[in-house]
Amino acid sequence: MHGPSEGVSEETDEANSAVKIVGGNVFVELDPDHPGFKDEGYRSRRNEIAKIALEWNEMSMDERRSKKIPHAPYSEDEDAVWAAIMERITPVHEKYACKQYLENARKLGLPNDRIPQLQEVSETLEEMTGFRQEPVGGLVHPKTFHTALANRVFLSTQYIRHSSRPFYTPEPDVVHELVGHTAMLGVPEWAELNVLFGKADMRTESEAAINRLGSVYWYVLEFGACRENGEV
C-alpha cells in the first residue's frame, strides 16, 4: 500500500520505510499519537510481523512463488477487533457495496471471528484471477507497489489496528487489505486494470511522473464510487 504522493527518498525496492533494523532487531517506527504507541505487547507483535515481511522480500520472485507466507502472530484481542469490524461492516456492505464486490466477498469467505492468514486468502484469490498477495511491513514507495501489480502481486500488510481504536486506523492494515481490496481483485476486469497501472508505472522515469500516476490510482482504484442499477 502507498499514499497518493509518497515522495520517499528510499530506493524503490525498499520494502517499508517505517521498518528499521536496530541493533540487528526489526523495529517498526510508530508516531507518538499512534493508538498502539505505548502498548509494548502490540509493538512486539508489530515488530515480529514486520520481520516476516522483511525476510519474505529478501527472497527472489521464484523463491516466493514456491513458499508459503509465514503466519502472523495475532492475539485474542486482535481477533476480537477483526470480529467487531466484520459485525459492523458486513451489513453496510450488503447495503452499499456493488454486486461484484459482494459476489467475490462470498467466494473469498473471510471468517468473521478471527483474522485470516494472508496465505489462505491469497490462495483463494489466485484461483480467481491469478493475483497473489504478499506481505509488506507498511506503506511502500508507489513504484514498488505498482511494479508488483504488473506481476499480479498485491502487496499487503499483515498487522491489525490497535484494539483501543477498532474502527479507525492511521495506516493500512490487514482489514484494509483483505476486506477492502481482495474481493475486487477477484474481478477479472478490475484485476487487469491493476496490472495495467503497474505496467504503466514501469515506464515512468521521474518521481513526479510516479506520483502523478499514483494519484490517479488513489482516486480511481483506492477510493471511488460506481453507478449500479441507477444508483451510486
Predicted regions span which residues?
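The feature captures two recurrent sequence modes
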Residues: 1-185
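A contiguous, surface-oriented mixed alpha/beta subdomain in the mid-to-C-terminal portion of proteins
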Residues: 161-232
